[in-house]
Amino acid sequence: ESHRLILGYFLFSTMTGLRISDVQNLTRKNFMDNYVSFVAKKTKLDQSIAMNKKAREIINHEPLLFEKKFADQHINDELKKIMTLLKIHKNVTFHVARHTFATSFLRAGGKVEKLQRLLGHTDIKQTMIYAHIVQADANSEIFLLDDLF
């Protein structure tokens, strides 16, 4: 059961970009319509984030999600076990979900300023780290055109 719940938390974070501390503090009361509203633990700022279809499917699929809490280290230990079971040989921690959300958002055409708000960053420099990663990917892929001409 803990594997299923922890995987649910992880996948929810890949769809919303929430920090592990914020996911851990959520209860079903934080969800209204298509939004999740909460006070960010790190910044103490109120946040209200729209949930996409996949995020809503994740919370609707698992009724115990956000009812059971785990220590951060336990979550990361369980993620390692899940990756081993799935034969994924990567060092995956919960923060990877947030990183995945950020880079996916930018690759899909999202704006850095919007991402800053979604991630709850108080300084745009924090968000620009993700923009630089996406730009580096784009720069490396420009050489794919060499084979066409």
Show where each model-derived region lies.
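Short basic/aromatic active-site micro-motif
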Residues: L5-I6, H89-G109, A131
